[in-house]
Amino acid sequence: MYKSFSMELAGRTLTVDVGRVAKQANGAAFMHYGDTVVLSTATASEKPRDGIDFFPLSVEYEEKMYAVGKIPGGFNKREGKASEHAILTSRVIDRPMRPLFPKDYRNDVTLNNMVMSVDPECDPEVVAMLGSAIATCISDIPFDGPCAMTQIGMIDGEFIVNPTLAQKAVSDLKLTVASTREKVIMIEAGAKEIPEAKMIDAIYKAHEVNQEIIKFIDSIVAEVGKPKHAYESCAIPEELFAAIKEIVPPAEMEEAVFSDDKQTREENIRVITEKLEEAFADNEEWLAVLGEAVYQYQKKTVRKMILKDHKRPDGRAITEIRPLAAEVDIIPRVHGSAMFTRGQTQICNVTTLAPLSEAQKLDGLDEFETSKRYMHQYNFPSYSVGETKPSRGPGRREIGHGALAERALVPVLPTEEEFPYAIRTVSETFESNGSTSQASICASTMSLMAAGGPIKKPVAGISCGLVTGETDDDYLVLTDIQGLEDFFGDMDFKVAGTHDGITAIQMDIKIHGLTRQIVEEAIARTKQAREYILTEVMEKAIAEPRKTVGEFAPKIIQMMIDPQKIGEVVGQRGKTINAIIDETGVKIDITDDGAVSICGTEQAMMDQAKKYIEIIASDFTEGQILTGKVVSIKDFGAFLEFAPGKEGLVHISKLAKQRVEKVEDVVSLGDVVKVVCMGKDKMGRVSFSIKDVPADAK
C-alpha cells in the first residue's frame, strides 16, 4: 500500500514515500528533500550467519553521477568502486544505526542508499541517513529506533540547520549529530577553532531538531510499520559463563588483564583460553563459542574494575594520559617527518610538498568541491598489532581515520597565496594500542611544521572513553583510552583542536546514547588533555613552523602575466612551454587569470624559467639589454633566440662597430651574445644591436 508522508525541515519539505518502490525489500523509503532524491532500503537475511561473533551490518551510499547530470569518466563510463566521500558517508550512517540493533543478532543486514538527484540546497547525506533510519524502523528487522540526524553550520556566529552546499563552503562549522528520543548517539564535526561551549550549544541545537524528526518517523511507523520478526539469538549460554568462572575465578581474570603491556595481557588470555579448551574438550557446542565467552568475561571484568574500583587495566588514574614522546626529522631526504608516541601507540608521519597542480581531483556529487590541496592518508599495517595479514590497500577504517586527521588540520592550513603547495601527509602506524587517529593528528601537525608549512597554530588530538552502569548517573569518563578500554567500553569520543578551540570531533558509542552531562564532561576532559599535549610535548619537540621548506622540497616562484599572453607562453600545441621545461627541468602551471607557478629544486633553473616567461610575455622596449643565442645566420644578419619561441634580428650593420663583410666573421651558430633593443624601425619591426651594448651592461 502506497503512502506519502511530509514534514517541514529547515524551511524545505521532506517527503517520504512508502510502498511506492522497492517493495521486495524488508523496508524501503523513497526520500525527497527539495529536489534531492534518495532511495533507502533495508534488507536482512532469513537466517543468521554461522561462525561469527559480530553483527554483520553493511551500509552502502551510492553516488549516481546522473544525479548531477554527469556521465562517469573511465573507459566503461559507469560508476565504479565507492569514492572516498561515499565511504565516509556510509560510515556516518553506520555509526548511529549499529548500536540500535540487538547485540545477539547475527543475520546479515544491508542498508542501501542510492542518490538519484542532488539539489544544492539539500544535502543528500542527511536524506540518506534519515532514509536508512525510516526504512529500518518500518521494516520487520529488529531495531531499537528511531534515530534522526541533523547537520548544523555556523556563519557569522549564527547556527544554520541543514545548510546548503553553498553555505557549507563558507561555514565555520560542519557538524552532524544523530540522536535517539532522549540522547545523542553520534557526533561528527569539522570546525574553525570553535570554543567548547559554542560547540555544545550547536550539538544540542541539532539534538532539538532531531526530536521533531523522530516524532515524524514515529507517525510513519504507526501507519505502515511491520511487526518485528523473531530471530535466533546468538547469546552465550549462562551455563558456560558459570563453568568458566569455576575454572577461572574473577580474581584470576582480573590479574590477567591488569597490565600496562598489551602483549603480556594477550599472552595471559591465551593461557586462560587454552586451559578452558582443555576443560571443555568434550563439549563441541561450548568450544564453538568459547572465544566469544572469554571475550565477554574479559569485558565484564574490565568494566567492573573501572566503574566500581576506579582501576584501569594499566594502572593509570582516570584522568591520566599515557607516557608521551615526540620528535621531528626522523626520516632523511623527505620534505618533513615526525613521530608521536603515546604508550604503545606510535605514529610516524611524513609530509610531501608539490605544486598545486598535484592537488587531488574530486569527481563526485558536490559541485562546490572539485579538488583538495591537503591530503592526509592513514595506513594500518598488520605488524602494528603483531599480526600477519596481506596488505590489500586502505579499508573503510583507514579512510575514516585519515579523513578525521585531515579535517582536524584544514582550519589551520595557510592559504594557497601564503603557501602555494599541494600537501600530502601520510601517517604510518608503527604500533597500535588505541587512539592511532589522534596520534596521527599530533604527528601530522609536527611533520608539517618540520616541512616548513606555515600552519597558523599546532593541533593535537585526544580520545576519551566511557564505562556506564545501570543508570544515567552511574558512569565514568576515561581520559586517553587504550585499545582494551575502547573494545570493552561504551564510547570513543575523539576531539582535536588548538589552544583556542575545537577543529574536529568524532564520537562513536556502543550504547543507546549519551546524556548532556556526559557530553559536556568528555569535551571538558579532552580540552584539558589537549592543552597538556600541546604545551608539554609537541611544542617542546618543535615550537613553530620552520621559516623555509626543507632542502629536498621543491621551491616555488609565483608571477603574474597578461592573460592575453598565455597563448604565446604555451605556444602551438605546448611547444614553447615544453621547451622551457625541457631546458630548465622545472614544472610550470598557468591558470586562466595569468597566474604562473614555477616549481623546481634548483633555484638557478627556476630563475631562468622565470626570465624566459617574462621575455615571452612582455613586449621588447628600447634600451632593454637581453642575452640571446644565435639560431640562424642570413646574409643580412643573425637571428637570436632570447627565449623559446621569442626571436629577434641583429642586422649585419649592427654586429660590430667596424664594417662587417660576412655575418660569420662576427658570430657563429650557437654563440650566446648580449644585445640591446634599438626600438622599432620605420617598418615597425623591432631591431637589436650588438655594437651598441653599453660597456657596463650586465
Model-derived segments and their meaning:
Residues 1-232:
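Long, basic N-terminal domains or extensions that often function
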Residues 1-45, 53, 230-369, 554-568, ...:
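Extended amphipathic alpha-helical scaffolds
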Residues 25-110, 115-117, 122, 188, ...:
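Glycine-rich, flexible beta-strand/loop modules in the N-terminal catalytic cores of phosphate-handling
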Residues 27-29, 122-141, 328-351, 433-453, ...:
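Conserved phosphate/anionic-ligand binding catalytic regions in large, soluble enzymes, centered on
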Residues 33, 42-44, 61-63, 113-117, ...:
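Flexible glycine-/small-residue-rich
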Residues 103-109, 144-146, 213-231, 263, ...:
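Flexible, glycine/charged-enriched surface loops at secondary-structure junctions
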Residues 140-257, 448-547:
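Mobile "lid/hinge" segments at catalytic clefts and subdomain interfaces of large enzymes
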Residues 552-556, 563-698:
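Single-stranded RNA-binding regions, centering on S1/OB-family and related RNA-binding modules
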